[in-house]
């Protein structure tokens, strides 16, 4: 599929206009952030302190594990929580994880799978969120958490977010005919096809405001 240069130009303007995120998520060393909005997280800092994740205003989804560490003689041992997937909504805020602490490995092993946690702002106010566990009964090493989050959202889990779905009509592929279904939700979920342009379309559309999305949809209709 070949995108009209005007579409790409419009999408580039969306990206430039929204390069500065409005929500800052602080991620401590004992939180393993695995996916953000179905994509590999891009963080700043974090060598000897919290990592910083920049997010857009509105609804976001994260996948993470809590991994507290404990001294055991000359060794350091870790305890792993289940993989948690959660969605939350926030605007113009800096958010921090509020997680339990455990006295020892025994207590961590007993309680970590049922732990209660929160995201709080700089005033200590908790952010409303919906959480679930992203479980995989198979081999845990090498899991593709962003792909698992995408499939989770497609299946409509309790912590699912919406998506932009682009489906290529293979029966009319020679005519480059594509059906585009625009969602009012915030992130891409499924792409059938191999075009890099479609991936860029997903990314830029997800960063656009509601007003820009409406204008973009109207522009697309006018091109037909």
UniProtKB/Swiss-Prot annotation:
Pfam hit, one: DUF2057
Family: Belongs to the UPF0319 family.
Keywords: Signal
Annotated InterPro entries: UPF0319 (IPR018635)
Protein name: UPF0319 protein VC_1853
Signal peptide: 1-21
């Amino acid at each position: 599929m070949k995108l009209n240069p005007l579409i790409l130009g419009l999408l580039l303007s969306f990206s430039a206009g929204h390069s500065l995120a409005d929500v800052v998520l602080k991620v401590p060393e004992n939180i393993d952030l695995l996916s953000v909005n179905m994509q590999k997280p891009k963080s700043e800092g974090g060598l000897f302190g919290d990592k910083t994740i920049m997010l857009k205003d509105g609804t976001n989804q994260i996948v993470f594990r809590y991994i507290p560490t404990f001294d055991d003689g000359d060794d350091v041992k870790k305890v792993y929580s289940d993989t948690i997937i959660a969605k939350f909504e926030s605007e113009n805020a800096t958010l921090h994880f509020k997680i339990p602490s455990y006295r020892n490995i025994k207590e961590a092993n007993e309680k970590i799978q049922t732990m209660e946690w929160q995201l709080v702002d700089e005033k200590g106010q908790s952010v409303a969120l919906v959480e679930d566990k992203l479980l995989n009964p198979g081999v845990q090493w090498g899991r593709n958490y962003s792909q698992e989050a995408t499939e989770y959202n497609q299946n409509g889990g309790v912590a699912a977010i919406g998506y932009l779905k682009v489906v290529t009509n293979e029966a009319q592929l020679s005519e480059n005919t594509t059906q585009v279904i625009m969602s009012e939700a915030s992130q891409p979920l499924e792409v059938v096809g191999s075009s890099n342009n479609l991936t860029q379309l997903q990314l830029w559309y997800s960063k656009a405001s509601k007003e820009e999305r409406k204008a973009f949809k109207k522009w697309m209709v006018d091109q037909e």
